[in-house]
Amino acid sequence: MPGGDTTPEEAAAPSCAGYNPGLLLFRAQKAQGACVTSTEGAWPRRASALYGGRKMRCGESGAGPDPRSNSAEVSSSQPALASKSQSKWGPTSNNPRGALTTTEFEMAGNRSQNIKHKQTALIAIPMSSQTPRMLGRPRNQGQLYPQP
């Protein structure tokens, strides 16, 4: 069951978020650190709504198993997001050579393609209002980590 559920979700996700990763990528370039934290915070709410929608469309059993599989998938996806973001942030922040420009952009692209596909549409909208705040923070964070 879970194996069959994941494939249609992933297959349907790129079509929904196909036009938005551009927005997210540009946001992620400038707002690296805050982007990760804000998206992690947004996962449970957005993922529950999105998973619910996808599950309903798949037409698996109906309302009974839906909330159970929902909570299971959201809870399982959250640690994966945290671990992946940490593993990617470790090497990028430790790299003194332009880690905030090229590698950060590549990492942001990989992150959005791998994990956030289902949510890019929802995330890109609130990002726009917070970008002015985020622009200052990640640069300071990026400079603080490699120095010591």
UniProtKB/Swiss-Prot annotation:
Region (Disordered): 55-148
Polar residues bias: start-end ranges: 68-104
Protein name listed in UniProt: Putative uncharacterized protein DNAJC9-AS1
